[in-house]
Amino acid sequence: MKPVLYAHPFASYCWKVLIALYENHTAFTYRSLGPEDPEAATELEALWPLKKFPVLVDDGRPVIESSVIIEYLTLRYPGPVRLIPAEPEAALEVRFLDRYFDNYIMTPMSKIVTNQIRPEERRDPYGVEEARAALDTAYRWLDGTMRRRTWAAADDLTLADCAAAPSLFYADWAHPIGETFSHVRSYRARLLARPSVARVVDEARPFRQFFPLGAPERD
């Protein structure tokens, strides 16, 4: 039986897992969390009361958190693209950069986006200012790191790049990556040219109108 993924095409952490699945052509059943499948949300809540997604179900076992799901896929459904290196120290670098993209790019980006959704009287301009400064710092560090790299942590795409793609895609919409960070901009372009990433971007296009800050006319 194929694993089942509960996800939404526009959600950044869902992209992360979808990229991993598409990279290795892993067969799965996609339960899209939207009006076209109203039962999916009810099933998700039964599996994970926090109602966070994505959630993967395999042989009746729920696997939760995007990084853990990708680790699980590498164990149960390995493919030609090794998303976690076999060599332990190389794997540590991949896991570190996975956390870097989630914690230091995705998190401040999410603060900027979430602030826009709030009622105007409850918005937090200072928090947004802090988030923008944090993103500039994160871009600067990453620019130096990517100076001599094609992919985040290895010679080919890994878990780290699965995290990087949605992080940098949406972060550039929320707080544009400046021209001074040319290596980050080039890396983002390479990610968007990768077939698995291009696929998730295309699948999300119908939902761009819902981006709280307004989706730019690009990408």
What are these regions, as identified by a protein language model?
Residues 29, 182, 211-212:
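Compositionally biased, low-structure terminal segments
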Residues 46, 82-83, 115, 178, ...:
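Short, charged/polar low-complexity linear motifs in solvent-exposed/disordered segments
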Residues 31, 66, 156, 201-202:
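Residue-level detector of family-conserved "landmark" positions at structurally sensitive sites
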Residues 68, 89, 183, 196, ...:
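Residue-level recognition of oxygen-bearing side chains
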Residues 35-36, 157, 206-207:
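Positions that flank functional sites
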Residues 101-195, 200:
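GST-like fold's C-terminal all-alpha helical module
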Residues 203-219:
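Acidic/histidine-enriched, glycine/proline-rich intrinsically disordered or flexible terminal extensions
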Residues 1-129:
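GST-like domain detector, emphasizing the conserved glutathione-binding G-site
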